[in-house]
Amino acid sequence: GDIVQDVNIPIELDANDGFEDRTGYIVIKNQGDVVEVSDTLYVTQRLYSQIVYVKAGANGDGSSWERAFGTIEEGLSACAHYGDMQMWVAAGDYYLKDWIEFKKVNFYGGFEGKETTVSERTMKRKSILHAASSNVWPSVYMYKLTEGATRVVDGFEFVDSKGKKGEGALVAYEYWMIRNCVVRNNTCARDAGGAYFLCTLINCVIRDNETLSTSSTINVQQSTCLYNVTVVNNRSAGSSAGVR
């Protein structure tokens, strides 16, 4: 009968940075002087997307709303530091598995899941990032950017952090711009219960956070800029339940 043999063929493809999907093929043939084609494999390479899509409950490759990733972690894994990429996250609840680092790209939340531009968002709901219950550190880290390389985080809620170390739900360093976001229902045993900021905040709400130590609820460092930021109903075991 026919002889069946598994054949492993390593393939390397350059990123498809064109404007449409592209298709190629691989011809499998025998070795030797007599050429005998035994099979042809066709390969379709999807267009390289500058936008990574995330939608709770989805199970795709992140290349469109219809093929979105289902978790924040999957979306982050597809982003590269300082790339010209954006991560678009549909409104809904996302339960983190551990603390995460926001790659140095732009992050937009609050989508319905059909928009083609950021300006189409109605922002009726935000993308809510729930802290992992086992995580004792801040849920989200936004590390210092290269000077002049501002990145935006827009349309998210950071909630349910129960930190024992570090500062509250998130830590954001220089040159990040946080817009239209909410930090709520977080506690920390050691430092700021809400967040540590060394960045710019615009149209944000920081509420219902608690610090169990003598620290403030929000730790704001020297170059932080606050524009239309509401700080309300926060609690501290020390003398400052607001901003330090």
Where are these regions (language model features)?
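Extracellular beta-strand/beta-solenoid scaffold signature
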Residues: 126-144, 162-171, 187-194, 210-221, ...
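N-terminal extracellular ligand-recognition/capping segment immediately after the signal peptide
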Residues: 83-106, 110-117
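Acidic Gly/Asp/Thr-rich repetitive segments characteristic of extracellular carbohydrate-active
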Residues: 56-89
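Right-handed parallel beta-helix/beta-spiral solenoid domain characteristic of secreted/periplasmic
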Residues: 105-165
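A short beta-strand micro-motif common to beta-rich folds, especially ectodomain repeats
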Residues: 9-11, 20-32
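Right-handed parallel beta-helix
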Residues: 148-160, 175-187, 198-210, 221-235, ...
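Surface-exposed binding patches on compact interaction domains or structured appendages
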Residues: 1-12
